[in-house]
Structures are given as structure tokens and as C-alpha cells.
């Protein structure tokens, strides 16, 4: 524990926390041709590659992911949630933060139901997370 005189000479330093989704924390100013720091909840991007990946040890599957070039120029790997998708190269998508625990290097999710990423078809529960509209038959009077 520091003494009073030690605290007088050098005050306590705040801890610097490293971001878990760094690509969402800055933008590109095309007029000045430089990065500017600001946080955004999502960013738009263009898919450069859409393919599958196998997860880490205890799990087994073919997880769908896309390589996305964001509007700030960064290229990130983003997971495509839900069953089935219509994404291909040059699709415009919305990317949010959030890692996939069993896929190394995947720190972002693609938002379903926004831009070119269509919502999951025939989804009845948890629809808001997958961009699925409320079915006509289930509407109340």
C-alpha cells in the first residue's frame, strides 16, 4: 500500500481496458484521409469471402462466417447466425460486436434482417435476434 507522500508525487493511474471489438471504435475520414476515433454500435461492410469453418475441440459443425471489409477500411471476420443465409461476395451487411466462443478469431456478428442479410425463414421464437417478421397467422385480433 502506498504512503501519502508517494501518492502526492505520483497519483493513482486508471487501468486501460483493451476493447473486445476494436474495429467498431474508429472511422475513416475520406476528406482528411485519416482515422478518427469514435465508437459506433454497428458498422456497414461488404463481404469479401463467405465460407465455413470448423469449431474448437469438443464441438463439431460447419459454422458459416464472412470476411467483411468495413466502411472504415478494416477487414474483419464476422459470424453469420441462424439456419441458412443468402449472403455471397459483394453483399452489403451490418456488423455488430460479439464473439463466437468456439471459433478462434471471430469477434463480430452479422445482423440478420438488415441490409442484404435476410432474416431467418420460418423462425417462431427469438425472432428479433434473427430478423424474422411476425407470421401472419399468429397475429392477435
Swiss-Prot record:
Modified sites of kind 3-methylthioaspartic acid: 102
Compositionally biased region (Polar residues): 1-11
Keywords: Methylation, Ribonucleoprotein, Ribosomal protein, RNA-binding, rRNA-binding, tRNA-binding
GO molecular function, one term: structural constituent of ribosome
Membrane-spanning intervals of the chain: none
Gene Ontology biological process terms, A to Z: translation
UniProt-listed Pfam families: Ribosom_S12_S23 (PF00164)
Keyword Zinc attached: no
Source organism, top-level taxon: Bacteria
GO cellular component assignments: small ribosomal subunit
UniProt-listed CDD domains: Ribosomal_S12
Region (Disordered): 1-22
Quaternary structure note: Part of the 30S ribosomal subunit. Contacts proteins S8 and S17. May interact with IF1 in the 30S initiation complex.
Purpose of the protein: With S4 and S5 plays an important role in translational accuracy. Interacts with and stabilizes bases of the 16S rRNA that are involved in tRNA selection in the A site and with the mRNA backbone. Located at the interface of the 30S and 50S subunits, it traverses the body of the 30S subunit contacting proteins on the other side and probably holding the rRNA structure together. The combined cluster of proteins S8, S12 and S17 appears to hold together the shoulder and platform of the 30S subunit.
Family per record: Belongs to the universal ribosomal protein uS12 family.
Descriptive protein name: Small ribosomal subunit protein uS12
Annotated organism of origin: Acholeplasma laidlawii (strain PG-8A)
Amino acid at each position: 500500500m502506498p504512503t501519502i507522500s508517494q501518492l502526492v508525487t505520483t497519483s493513482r493511474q486508471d487501468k486501460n481496458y483493451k476493447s473486445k471489438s476494436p474495429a467498431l471504435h474508429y472511422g475513416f475520414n475520406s476528406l482528411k484521409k485519416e482515422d478518427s476515433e469514435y465508437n459506433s454500435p454497428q458498422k456497414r461492410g461488404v463481404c469479401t469471402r463467405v465460407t465455413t469453418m470448423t469449431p474448437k475441440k469438443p464441438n463439431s459443425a460447419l459454422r458459416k462466417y464472412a470476411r467483411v471489409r468495413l466502411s472504415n477500411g478494416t477487414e474483419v471476420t464476422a459470424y453469420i447466425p441462424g439456419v441458412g443465409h443468402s449472403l455471397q461476395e459483394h453483399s452489403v451487411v451490418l456488423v455488430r460486436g460479439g464473439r463466437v466462443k468456439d471459433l478462434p478469431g471471430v469477434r463480430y456478428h452479422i445482423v440478420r434482417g438488415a441490409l442484404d442479410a435476410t432474416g431467418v425463414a420460418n423462425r417462431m421464437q427469438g425472432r428479433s435476434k434473427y430478423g424474422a417478421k411476425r407470421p401472419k397467422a399468429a397475429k392477435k385480433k
